[in-house]
Amino acid sequence: MNYKGGKFIWHNNQIIDWGEAKVHVLSHALHYGSSVFEGIRVYKTPSGLKVFRLGDHIQRLYNSAKIYRMPIPFTKKEISEACKELIRKNELNNGAYIRPIAFRGYGEIGLAPKDDHPVDVSIAAWEWGTYLGAEALENGVDVCVSSWQRVAPNTIPTQAKAGGNYLSSTLISTEAKRLGFDEGIALSTDGMVSEGAGENLFLIKDGSIYTPPASSGILTGITRDTVIKLCEKAGLIVKEQSITRESLYLADEIFFTGTAAEITPIKSVDRILIGNGKKGAITAQLQNKFFGLFSGDTKNHDHWLESI
């Protein structure tokens, strides 16, 4: 696998060569999925490299660790500075993707780890383009409703961005691609729309914007929150409410949001065209506002951008 620009890894407060980043086969996380992680974008802007909403991502990392009773042995400031140090060390001057991960490392195997079970932290960074394909941001993607549902409430905490949670996402995305789609959409256990395999979802009908609520089994994404706030600034109201499957087919526009996906239009669901099958006007408007954060065209959000 070619992780372009990836030369060094930050691991437990040390910078090591990429190829030296290894874990023991009896690490707890390898057996039980006991890891929490983040995905963070770095954008090239007219005033230099900027990390997008770094503080919010690091806070969510610690929230996820708290839910799983997994204390991270570094401060938030130390992890934030390590992310920026790694960008500099790897000389990722055209933008990057950062992946910090905290995980239960080598120790006694068992489902209930002891309080002193070691928690390791690693950070990787590399160049990464569009998540769902080179032309996805402009032309949109074809998606299907998955046969796999999101988990029921009080089963697995969906507000934790945890490694084990993503086995569900792997099933959804793998099924979609095997069937010839770009991505899959999961329903919740009550049959309502939840989210994509690794993305939140917005639907537009008759000028109104809808997105599934937190109670639908979603991870409430930071890009999702960004879009909601950009809508508020533009005088667009986002309604967080349940969405039926058939509402997808009848929508005027649908788009995914996520750190990796950014704002990606959906052109069809289950081979049914959405609108005219092209990127809609509101989706385009929000894309422009989102990417304008990094070009300087969208003003008054400098607090979301942190210099390297």
Could you describe each region identified by the protein language model?
Residues I72, K76, C83, L92-P100:
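Ordered, amphipathic secondary-structure segments that act as subunit-interaction surfaces
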Residues R88-N90:
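Non-catalytic accessory segments adjacent to catalytic cores
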Residues I101-G105:
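Short loop/turn motifs enriched for small/polar and acidic residues
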